[in-house]
């Protein structure tokens, strides 16, 4: 395996993959100039960091280390905050690509493994579709994969430098998402599961990781404390909406059951935490987690992975197996907590678990390659593999949805026709930010019905309406004092309507 990692072909494929990853990011960003709604909170926090420093940013927004990095990048480069954020995301995707290929090479023997790993991560639709979004997750995933690489190497060699690499990667992951604390706490215990070593040898390997983890966290607490920032208070503030749900976890679970329509099957005759009621509850929660994971993988890829896992029963090599399983288990547990506490599904929170599953695919593809070569069907394998790459690339890089050009047109019109000193009310983050007419562009109320009721003292109302907002359209047409001055829409009738308030 060491020879494989040092092989120039393995090195070359990672460099090529990183370059392609950056190219894909540029393509996706260019075709999606309007970022996700969460992006505007990160941008506003970065602006606050530039104006008032880290303490003010953390006090106002909580655990926004990602925004601090955006602000620092913005101060060093001749770019605006948005461009700096896109640059960081492009680099984080490149780092994730590099880490995934390296991790697959650590987990499986074979000279073709890096190539298949590069192909998988580059055409993985869930990642590609999010490349234009400003999210801290890309760095978090990359750091977690890097930590797993170092943990596997430490498990194999016992070298302290790998232990230090694991600690630094995990501390950096925590800098982006506090959920990394769970993996930081759990992952070292993978070293206790090795079948070859005695328990004394396992404990001897575990000790350096425990010491380094404690030293790393203590050092971070001390540095921030000396800077006048109390991380415990920041943690409480960042999770102020979720901690009460954890303290009353029974009601939280029942709330999750109600949100997922499990309450239909639970009644006074079928208590939720005993007997059949408990089975129904566990099945529902487990189904939610697995459905979220399948959505993150993509339904087709999830079915193929399940089939190949059943047929080939492939696992990472022995020295990598338990660290990989602990990271998979930790990420699934984090997803479980998210589903129970937040009570809705989103594939983004399942990507870490999906990446752990995708680590198995290069070995499956390599086995298919070997089988095809033995059966003299290699040309067929190559054609099918190329077709799959083409399909996933087009599917994830080309947008087949309804155009959002109308949003850009509305922004251009507003910048040209609305005076800069106007008081503007809007329910669109994008219009608030790009027009420069709303100072608190991250505090937008997105409900058009609520926005229609908060126009007092304003000069213009810029209303974002989806094709389903019939009630808001009717109310706006009847509301006194609103004069429509511009209307922009796509073929589905998603629209931006601009009103002058008389």
Question: Predicted regions span which residues?
Answer:
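Signature aromatic-anchored transmembrane alpha helix within multi-pass, membrane-resident enzymes
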Residues: 112, 168, 188, 210-214, ...
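Short helix- or helix-capping micro-motifs
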Residues: 21, 116-125, 149, 170-174
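Loop-to-helix entry region of an early transmembrane alpha helix in multi-pass inner-membrane enzymes
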Residues: 64, 68, 77-95, 130, ...
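Membrane-embedded, lumen/periplasm-facing catalytic core of multi-pass transferases
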Residues: 50, 104, 151, 384-439, ...
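Hydrophobic, aromatic-rich transmembrane alpha-helices
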Residues: 275-320, 331
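Short acidic/glycine- and proline-prone juxtamembrane loop motifs at membrane-interface regions
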Residues: 37, 62, 132-139, 346
């Amino acid at each position: 395996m060491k020879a494989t990692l040092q092989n120039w072909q393995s090195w070359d494929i990672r460099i090529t993959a990183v370059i392609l990853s950056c190219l894909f990011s540029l393509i996706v960003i260019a075709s999606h100039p309007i970022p996700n709604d969460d992006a505007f909170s990160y941008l506003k926090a970065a602006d606050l960091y530039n104006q008032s420093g880290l303490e003010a940013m953390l006090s106002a927004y909580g655990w926004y280390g990602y925004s601090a990095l955006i602000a620092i990048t913005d101060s060093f480069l001749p770019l605006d905050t948005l461009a700096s954020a896109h640059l960081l995301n492009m680099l984080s995707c490149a780092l994730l690509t590099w880490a995934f290929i390296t991790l697959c090479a650590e987990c499986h023997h074979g000279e073709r493994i890096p190539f298949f790993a590069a192909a998988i991560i580059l055409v993985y639709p869930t990642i590609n579709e999010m490349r234009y979004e400003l999210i801290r997750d890309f760095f978090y995933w990359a750091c977690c994969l890097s930590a797993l690489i170092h943990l596997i190497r430490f498990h194999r060699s016992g070298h302290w430098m790998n232990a230090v690499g694991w600690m630094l990667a995990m501390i950096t992951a925590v800098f982006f998402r506090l959920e990394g604390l769970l993996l930081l706490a759990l992952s070292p215990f993978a070293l206790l599961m090795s079948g070859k070593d005695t328990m004394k040898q396992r404990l001897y390997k575990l000790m350096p990781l425990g010491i380094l983890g404690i030293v790393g966290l203590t050092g971070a607490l001390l540095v921030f404390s000396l800077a006048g920032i109390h991380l415990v208070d920041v943690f409480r503030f960042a999770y102020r909406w979720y901690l009460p749900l954890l303290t009353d976890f029974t009601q939280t679970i029942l709330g999750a059951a109600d949100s997922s329509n499990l309450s239909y099957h639970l009644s006074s005759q079928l208590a939720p935490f005993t007997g059949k009621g408990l089975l129904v509850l566990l099945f529902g929660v487990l189904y939610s987690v697995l459905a979220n994971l399948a959505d993150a993988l993509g339904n087709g890829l999830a079915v193929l992975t399940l089939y190949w896992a059943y047929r080939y029963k492939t696992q990472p090599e022995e020295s990598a197996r338990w660290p990989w399983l602990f990271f998979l288990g930790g990420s699934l547990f984090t997803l479980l907590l998210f589903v129970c506490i937040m009570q809705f599904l989103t594939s983004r929170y399942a990507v870490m678990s999906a990446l752990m599953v995708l680590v198995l695919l290069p070995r499956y593809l390599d086995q298919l390659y070997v089988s095809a070569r033995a059966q003299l069907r290699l040309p067929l394998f190559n054609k099918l593999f190329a077709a799959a790459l083409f399909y996933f690339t087009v599917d994830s890089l080309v947008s087949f949805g309804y155009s959002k050009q109308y949003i850009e047109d509305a922004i251009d019109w507003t910048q040209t026709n609305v005076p800069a000193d106007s008081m503007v009310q809007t329910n669109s983050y994008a219009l608030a930010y790009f027009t420069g007419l709303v100072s608190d562009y991250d505090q937008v109320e997105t409900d058009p019905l609520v926005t229609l009721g908060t126009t007092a003292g304003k000069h213009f109302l810029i209303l974002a309406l989806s094709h389903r907002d019939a009630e808001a359209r009717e109310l706006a047409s009847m509301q006194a004092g609103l004069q429509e001055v511009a209307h922009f829409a796509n073929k589905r009738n998603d629209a931006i309507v601009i009103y002058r308030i008389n």
